[in-house]
Amino acid sequence: MSKPAAAASHDGVNRAKPYQLMLFPLNNGATNVYFVLILSYVAQFGSSILKLGMFASIMVTVMRIADAVTDPIIGALMDRTSTRIGKFRPFMILGSAVMAISVIILYCLLPLIPESMMALRYISFTLVYFIWVLGYTFQTSCTRAGQTVLTNDPSQRPLFTIFNTIGSLLGMGVMQFMIPLVKAGFDVKDEAGVLISSGYANPELYRIITPIGIAISVLLTALAIIGIAEKDRPEYYGIGGKDQKKVKFSEYAQILKENKPMQRLMVAGAGCKLALAIATNTTVLLALYGIVMGNYNSLYLPMMVLGYVFAVPFFLLSVRTSQKKGQKASLTRYVSIALICYVGVLALLLFSQNGNPARMLSFPFEGGSGINLYTILFILCFGIGYGAYYATADMPIPMVADCSDYETYRSGKYIPGIMGTMFSLVDKLVSSLAQTLVAFIFLL
């Protein structure tokens, strides 16, 4: 064993340096940029710009059938990869490059195909989106699998949630904040200020947000590569740098069948991701703030900031709970709080009544008489619910590394790649399912 490995595992624990804990989670922020750029807007883009109707929404879900084949193959390939720059960094670099090129083609070049060649639009959209999905799998799988080499210290892994959230704010948060601002500049209104055409129907919007999103993602990817560089070496592959048994393709199904913790984690992670995908869906937010509350441009950003403010104390509480009682206990506790509060939000929305000031949101800056009891209750339920949920939304990610470590202890096999891609598969399935669910709900 090399000196670095020996130093890291002299007491049986592989610990990460502070800068490694802070930088590597930015890989998730890098992919979350595309989560917003693609999964939140591709359906609207396909419908309003490419004129594909519901095809884009349905294709996002249907294509997951192919993922059931490609994801395990990518995971198995990762488990067998060992290059001069490590096991994980090649997939991070390749994934980032593939996604960047795919998004440029999708948002900037496909609209140039004339409407007289609609068949080519359908084929090109399907092909480009499929290639983008492969790149997304390459990079997202590293977020899960790479933690096995970064640290196996139970007191350090929960910290991933905090640093991951910082990365998400630098990626997903910036995109969620920036895109509506850019979109507002492309809104077409009449002299009375009534919206005639949404900025989301203007192809120029996508040509502006594409290079911005790519630049943010590439920067976060580069920082994440720096974070894992020292640990992406053979002596850190597995528990304590032990030699690992080779795994045959035929063995993967049996391994996953016997790894009960991983099965339960995939179910929990699917629920968290589905809730996030629906709650942050563009169509849902437009309906909530624009139709139900009547002022999307004035309410969207303040409510988003409110949620982040409430999330701060929950991040600290969830990490503390994870370190004391384990990540499972922390996830269960704070998701339960979020569920109760969101039920309260639903009840308040059902109770609201247009024309009745006591049963509507009222803010002084919107011409209201002041903040009423209904508004206070809504802010508390929404803020606490969003804060508790957001603090645990990515908690299943470090738990994938725990499941991989469990498999190494159980069978002696080190397969972080297949663990990461299986979780990524579920992640993409439910994210895409959210698009289809939202589309069908609004059709009813």
Describe the role of every protein-language-model region.
Residues 2-444:
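Membrane-embedded alpha-helical bundles of multi-pass transporters/translocases
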